[in-house]
Amino acid sequence: MAARLCCQLDPARDVLCLRPVGAESRGRPFSGPLGTLSSPSLSAVSTDHGAHLSLRGLPVCAFSSAGPCALRFTSARRMETTVNAHQILPKVLHKRTLGLPAMSTTDLEAYFKDCVFKDWEELGEEIRLKVFVLGGCRHKLVCAPAPCNFFTSA
């Protein structure tokens, strides 16, 4: 089973943050711009850099109590659809990190809410998720335009 991560939009940094959720606690839900999400309590966030999690290739900041610096992710299958093909999400996100015109924050929120959360939470397709760590992080691992799959089964 893949490790469970909680996603939270950080409007101050205009990024989606992933936070590891410990098996002992799923945290309490909170309502935000992307709907009701699960937010881990501080005790549920690992301080051992995620040694107990079945994740590979994530930067050390992904397991910080403050959350990762700039993790962005999407569903591979949704990126391959004709609707989203012209957007090429990794390139869109990279443009945003450079301050160039790209998809609006509102559009990105809708994209992640409708595509990622549905596939991940409802269908349990963790293996299909791709991780993009772009810009503003000294721990960054850039995977664009050819994304890598960092979610592995335990």
Swiss-Prot record:
Gene that this sequence comes from: X
Listed GO CC annotations: host cell mitochondrion; host cell nucleus
PTM (free text): A fraction may be phosphorylated in insect cells and HepG2 cells, a human hepatoblastoma cell line. Phosphorylated in vitro by host protein kinase C or mitogen-activated protein kinase. N-acetylated in insect cells.
Family: Belongs to the orthohepadnavirus protein X family.
Quaternary organization: May form homodimer. May interact with host CEBPA, CFLAR, CREB1, DDB1, E4F1, HBXIP, HSPD1/HSP60, NFKBIA, POLR2E and SMAD4. Interacts with host SMC5-SMC6 complex and induces its degradation. Interacts with host TRPC4AP; leading to prevent ubiquitination of TRPC4AP. Interacts with host PLSCR1; this interaction promotes ubiquitination and degradation of HBx and impairs HBx-mediated cell proliferation.
Natural source organism: Hepatitis B virus genotype D subtype ayw (isolate Italy/CI/1992) (HBV-D)
Subcellular location: Host cytoplasm; Host nucleus; Host mitochondrion
Classification via Pfam families: X
UniProt KW keywords: Activation of host NF-kappa-B by virus, Activator, Apoptosis, Host cytoplasm, Host G2/M cell cycle arrest by virus, Host mitochondrion, Host nucleus, Host-virus interaction, Modulation of host cell cycle by virus, Transcription, Transcription regulation
The protein's role, per its UniProt record: Multifunctional protein that plays a role in silencing host antiviral defenses and promoting viral transcription. Does not seem to be essential for HBV infection. May be directly involved in development of cirrhosis and liver cancer (hepatocellular carcinoma). Most of cytosolic activities involve modulation of cytosolic calcium. The effect on apoptosis is controversial depending on the cell types in which the studies have been conducted. May induce apoptosis by localizing in mitochondria and causing loss of mitochondrial membrane potential.
Protein name (database record): Protein X
Superkingdom in the source lineage: Viruses
One of the protein's GO biological processes: symbiont-mediated activation of host NF-kappaB cascade
Region of interest called Mitochondrial targeting sequence, as start-end residue ranges on this chain: 68-117
